[in-house]
Structures are given as C-alpha cells and as structure tokens.
C-alpha cells in the first residue's frame, strides 16, 4: 500500500489484527520493510496477536526517492506522518540500526505517540569525525562504482561470518535490496546518518518500556553501545543475540522473535 506523506509516496504493509495494539517496524539502511518479512520473520510472528505496520523509509524499497536531500529529522516527520495517516494515536516502535536512530529521535521529539520502544543493533551516539569521513568515502564509492559494488562491500560488514553459510538466502535478499536502491537515495541517506543528532542525553528521560537487542558479533553498533543505552534508560531490558552480527533479526530469528514477542506480550492491550 502507498500513503502520501510529506509530499512523498511511502510504501507500507498494515497486517494482523486491526483492533489490536499497533507495532511499527522501521528497517535499517539501506534495506526495506522486507527485512522484517524474511522467513519466519517479525511480521509473521506478530501478526496473529498485533496490528503490524512495516514501511519503507523514503528512498528505500518501494517508497519514492524524492529530492534525495534527507535528514533523520525528515525521516521522523515521515514516521509521524504515516502513523497520523493510519489513525494510530500511540504505538510500540521497533527500529534496527537507522530505524533505531529514527525511533530514538522520534521518542525524543514526540514521546506522547509511543507506548514502548525496541532498539535493535543501534546506538544513541552521533557519528564521530572518523565515521563521518567513512560516510563521505561511501558516498564517493557509490558515485564511482554504483550500488552493486556498494552492496557487496556492505553485506560483508553487517552479517556474522557463520550467516554466510547458515543463511545464504538472507544475504541474497539484503544484497538484492541494496542493489535496487537508487544511488541518490544511498548518498542522501549516508548524509542523513552523518548529520544525525546525538540522543544520549535524552535516554534518561525515556519513560516507556524499552527493550534493547544486539547481535553478539555486531561490529557496527557493538554490544558495548547497547549496554550503555541499557544503563541510561530506566528499567530497560537488554538481550545479546548469539550467532548474529548487525542483522540480528534475520540471523537468529527465533531468539530475536522470542524476546520481542515476550516483551510486547507484557505490555498488554
């Protein structure tokens, strides 16, 4: 389905029990909502008991690219615009990597719109100077070599070594999603990541139930970053997902879903 949000068509799915508590799934960069529908994925696990909304961030998946001038603030505007469009007053939000950055800024800006927070393979800190330089190098690489080469390099860094043997279909799916992403969107999103604000100072103000999950082998947003958020967010829960790196929801789906489902069940209706 498509919704017109901030003059951009945003692609989304809205499944499950329409009268149940809504859960919003926000994917990472540079993926799409399909990372949540991978075999026995989160959409399938939650749909029997929840209303599940998973969408493509602008410029990703089947959403419109627009002008390619992206910021995390704009991504938050789109999130709020989408839940307004869907008539959702308050939701549990689940964000992985970039999705986590969006969720953290959204709950900082609009805390009244969220009843729970799930942060996966993400962190509250803004990019360091070193990270910004790496983003700039990635933009140059996309412009020079195109999405296909970028995709090959990217998947090598986000999956645990054992995943390449255990779940080659997951690798293939993510690589194909990246390859189909417009260079303008890849570059615009890299700039958005590099310019995002640091939300660390707001973690102590988060008052909704919060679950944090991270792959034990995540080198991009490591377990130490998850532990720091866990210590800062009052009453938050932390689980380190074994046999997983930065794509913990796809690499160890059973473990990830177990913790997610149990957390959401505790919230009640």
Question: For each of these PLM feature ranges, what is it?
Answer:
Residues 206, 212-214:
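Short beta-strand/loop motif that positions the catalytic acidic residue
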Residues 216-221:
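Acidic catalytic loop of the alpha/beta-hydrolase fold
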Residues 223, 227-246:
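Catalytic histidine neighborhood in serine/cysteine hydrolases
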Residues 28-32, 97:
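Active-site glycine-rich loops that stabilize anionic/oxyanionic intermediates
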Residues 244-257:
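Catalytic histidine-centered segment of alpha/beta-hydrolase-like enzymes
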Residues 8, 13, 34-94, 110, ...:
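Active-site loop/oxyanion-hole signature of alpha/beta-hydrolase fold enzymes
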Residues 101-152:
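Flexible "cap/lid" loop of the alpha/beta hydrolase fold
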Residues 127-133, 144-205:
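Conserved alpha/beta-hydrolase catalytic His-Asp/Glu region
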């Amino acid at each position: 389905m498509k919704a017109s949000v901030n003059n951009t068509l945003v692609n989304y799915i809205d499944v499950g029990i329409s009268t149940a508590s809504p859960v919003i799934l926000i994917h990472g960069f540079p993926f799409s909502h399909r990372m949540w529908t991978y075999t026995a994925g989160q959409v399938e696990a939650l749909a029997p008991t929840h209303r599940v909304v998973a969408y493509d961030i602008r410029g990703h998946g089947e959403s419109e690219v627009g002008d390619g001038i992206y910021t995390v603030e704009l991504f938050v505007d789109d999130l709020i615009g989408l839940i307004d469009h869907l008539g959702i007053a308050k939701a549990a939000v689940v964000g992985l990597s970039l999705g986590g950055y969006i969720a953290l800024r959204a709950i900082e800006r609009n805390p009244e719109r969220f009843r729970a927070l799930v942060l996966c393979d993400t962190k509250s800190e803004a990019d360091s100077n070193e990270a910004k330089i790496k983003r700039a190098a990635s933009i140059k690489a996309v412009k020079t070599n195109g999405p296909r080469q970028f995709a090959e390099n990217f998947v090598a860094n986000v999956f645990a070594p054992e995943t390449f043997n255990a779940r080659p279909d997951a690798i293939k799916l993510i690589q194909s999603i990246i390859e189909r992403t417009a260079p303008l969107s890849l570059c615009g999103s890299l700039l958005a990541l590099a310019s995002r604000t640091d939300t660390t100072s707001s973690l102590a103000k988060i008052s909704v139930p919060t679950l944090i999950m991270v792959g034990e082998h995540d080198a991009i947003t490591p377990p130490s970053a998850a532990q720091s958020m866990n210590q800062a967010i009052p009453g938050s829960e932390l689980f380190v997902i074994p046999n997983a790196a930065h794509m913990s929801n796809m690499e160890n789906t059973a473990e990830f879903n177990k913790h997610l489902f149990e957390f959401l069940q505790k919230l009640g209706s």
